[in-house]
Amino acid sequence: MNPENWTQVTSFVLLGFPSSHLIQFLVFLGLMVTYIVTATGKLLIIVLSWIDQRLHIQMYFFLRNFSFLELLLVTVVVPKMLVVILTGDHTISFVSCIIQSYLYFFLGTTDFFLLAVMSLDRYLAICRPLRYETLMNGHVCSQLVLASWLAGFLWVLCPTVLMASLPFCGPNGIDHFFRDSWPLLRLSCGDTHLLKLVAFMLSTLVLLGSLALTSVSYACILATVLRAPTAAERRKAFSTCASHLTVVVIIYGSSIFLYIRMSEAQSKLLNKGASVLSCIITPLLNPFIFTLRNDKVQQALREALGWPRLTAVMKLRVTSQRK
């Protein structure tokens, strides 16, 4: 098409939602429950690590920031999906599309940086315990978190500017649940080679770079744990990073799967499912992983809910009845 005849598209239509009203209702209900549970889990971790003095240590400082980040990530995606299903209005303006895209990839990129920082924290705690408090003091922790957010903010700025400058002259239907990059790129009537190259290089660098740092950290942790003289010390060392390692495996596994599938241009349905797993299901699972595998968080949660006092009262009543 002659560039002079281009008519810039001002809005897009999300086509990834089912047409059946029953399925839409079930999807809406599932998304709403998932979002409420996810937000509640994230807020619990944030509040508990803030008010409980025993959790005022470096590991839970990073966990609090990680939970806040994932809460923002699901908030960028899920509420818009709920509004689309509830109102039946599948349109999204070009500006809103670019903003949602930037926020989604900014938060997702920051997620990888924070995971790498948390891996470094676990490495220093287990492999350099005598120097840990000096190397990972409160000031350093704050700087690392701030650097992660700033790096994520700048990392996706260039691809977003390139995306916003692309011409879109129709069609305007995005075959996805939310605004994702690859379905939108297919709609552009301009040259997308530079954007694809930049996006590929940056995404590969952040994914493999953070994964390499995380892998090296846990390789050193594993070597240190195996050298521990007793089984009790090995269990204690491993328990301090088991939940984080589980989250690392889930996030990197789903992200690499999604990255490979997107690159190979496989089934659209499979890509949609992988996207939902990466940005909705994974944040839902993470609070349960951190609480179920962490004794301190469990104890703080029980005390916040008043369970120890309730247990003590019940034992007192049983004792008095026996007398």
UniProtKB/Swiss-Prot annotation:
Which of the residues are on side Cytoplasmic? 47-54, 121-139, 218-237, 293-323
What domain of life does the UniProt record list for this protein's source?
Eukaryota
Give UniProt keywords alphabetically. Answer: Cell membrane, Disulfide bond, G-protein coupled receptor, Glycoprotein, Membrane, Olfaction, Receptor, Sensory transduction, Transducer, Transmembrane, Transmembrane helix
List locations, semicolon-separated: Cell membrane
Q: Which InterPro entries match?
A: GPCR_Rhodpsn, GPCR_Rhodpsn_7TM, Olfact_rcpt, Olfact_rcpt_6C-like
Q: How is this protein situated with respect to the membrane?
A: Multi-pass membrane protein
Q: List the disulfide bonds.
A: 97-189
Q: Which SUPFAM superfamilies match?
A: Family A G protein-coupled receptor-like
Which residue spans traverse the membrane? 26-46, 55-75, 100-120, 140-160, 198-217, 238-258, 272-292
One GO CC term on file: plasma membrane
A GO molecular function term, named singly, is:
G protein-coupled receptor activity
Extracellular-side stretches of the chain, per the record, are: 1-25, 76-99, 161-197, 259-271
Location (main, coarse): membrane
Q: Which residues are glycosylated?
A: 5
User: What is the documented function of this protein?
Assistant: Odorant receptor.
Concerning its family, UniProt says: Belongs to the G-protein coupled receptor 1 family.
The protein here is known as: Olfactory receptor 6T1
Originating organism: Homo sapiens
**Lineage, opening ranks:** Eukaryota, Metazoa, Chordata, Craniata, Vertebrata
